[in-house]
């Protein structure tokens, strides 16, 4: 999973992710928006489910984060397609709507995101 964090012209933190993980970047941009309390909530939830078979989810306005001890899924809340009406050979581009990654990679990315934000504000 490759990613980078940037400041846009208005000073807001934005993220870009590699093709198979674009939904994670969109989730950060739309749901987290630099709010470290959200990252703390996720880290706390992961500590609670670690070593168990339980899942935890965080439903946002545009995206939902679902995680268990081993994997994280980010999906757009509107990710429902009717495939009956599609022409043969056609498929939807959903890379910005659905992404999976390992929990460790996700937590490492969130730590990098936190560091970027803290450097931005010199806290």
UniProtKB/Swiss-Prot annotation:
<protein>
    <recommendedName>
        <fullName>UPF0231 protein plu3616</fullName>
    </recommendedName>
</protein>
<dbReference type="Pfam" id="PF06062">
    <property type="entry name" value="UPF0231"/>
</dbReference>
<dbReference type="InterPro" id="IPR008249">
    <property type="entry name" value="UPF0231"/>
</dbReference>
<comment type="similarity">
    <text>Belongs to the UPF0231 family.</text>
</comment>
């Amino acid at each position: 999973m490759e990613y980078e964090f940037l400041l846009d012209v208005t000073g807001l933190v934005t993220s870009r992710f590699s093709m198979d993980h674009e939904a994670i970047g969109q989730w950060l941009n739309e749901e987290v928006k630099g709010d470290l309390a959200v990252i703390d909530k996720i880290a706390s939830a992961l500590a609670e489910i670690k070593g168990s078979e339980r899942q935890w989810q965080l439903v946002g306005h545009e995206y939902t984060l679902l995680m268990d001890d081993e994997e994280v899924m980010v999906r757009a809340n509107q990710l429902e397609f009717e495939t009956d009406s599609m022409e043969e050979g056609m498929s939807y581009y959903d890379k910005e709507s659905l992404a999976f990654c390992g929990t460790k990679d996700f937590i490492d990315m969130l730590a990098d995101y936190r560091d970027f934000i803290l450097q931005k504000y010199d806290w």
